[in-house]
Amino acid sequence: MLLAWVQAFLVSNMLLAEAYGSGGCFWDNGHLYREDQTSPAPGLRCLNWLDAQSGLASAPVSGAGNHSYCRNPDEDPRGPWCYVSGEAGVPEKRPCENLSCPETTSQALPASTTEIEEASEGPGADEVQVFAPANALPARSEAAAVQPVIGISQRVRMNSKEKKDLGTLGYVLGITMMVIIVAIGAGIILGYSYKRGKDLKEQHDQKVCEREMQRITLPLSAFTNPTCEIVDEKTVVVHTSQTPVDPQEGSTPLMGQAGTPGA
């Protein structure tokens, strides 16, 4: 019983962890930032990058993916930012606040200068254009030449797996799975309780039946005892009639029947 509840609890925790994702950090211009921040400031919420960029002609071509977290696709010196809904409903760029991530010994460092030089020489012109922003300003033309290399270092993540927003359907499925697991656990408890009660009732009825049979069969056992068997008595009748015997010599009585001697 306890094992069933432990399994249900572990599965629920895994579903919640999959729905909300685990937090991580990413590098940007030599700093670590939290990877799962969805609010640039208190009271504001980031819009989905694909939805916001679809309505803007000046949005960065590279983008940041299908999510609503703070990123820096155009290498803004102020750090990561995101789109928020403006007064007229038009997406507006807003820098993210309180986004710093504490460094740990297990975090990877940015690419070295040697790797940057090799990366700048390796890819061709077509590959460089994939990382270069389309709306780079003329004043930043010199910095735009190294932006493709910075874009490569920016993709160094603490988590190799990019988090995805499951959306409302994912949350609904997670809650449904939790409800099903709880229902299964409750069903197991009820089934066990019912079966246990039924077994106890059958044992009680069997004991009552055995006591009743003992009470009924006890008087009959007395008659099966050999010492208590009843024997039929036989009446013996003795008759007093005598068989006539012939008289012999010497056997004549000295006195007759009439009582006269010598008769």
From Swiss-Prot:
How is this protein annotated for GO cellular component? Answer: plasma membrane
Please, which domain of life does this record's source organism belong to? Eukaryota
Compositional bias ranges of the Polar residues kind: 242-251
User: Disulfide connectivity?
Assistant: C25-C101, C46-C82, C70-C96
Q: Which residues form the Kringle domain?
A: 24-101
Which stretches are Extracellular in the membrane topology?
A: 22-168
Which range is the signal sequence, renumbered to this chain?
A: 1-21
Subcellular locations according to the entry: Cell membrane
* Region of interest called Disordered, as start-end residue ranges on this chain: 242-263
- Give UniProt keywords alphabetically: Cell membrane, Disulfide bond, Glycoprotein, Kringle, Membrane, Signal, Transmembrane, Transmembrane helix
What is this entry's stated membrane topology? Single-pass type I membrane protein
GO molecular function annotations of the record? phosphatidylinositol 3-kinase inhibitor activity
Main function? Negative regulator of hepatic phosphatidylinositol 3-kinase (PI3K) activity.
Name-wise, this protein is: Phosphoinositide-3-kinase-interacting protein 1
What is the species of this protein? Pongo abelii (Sumatran orangutan)
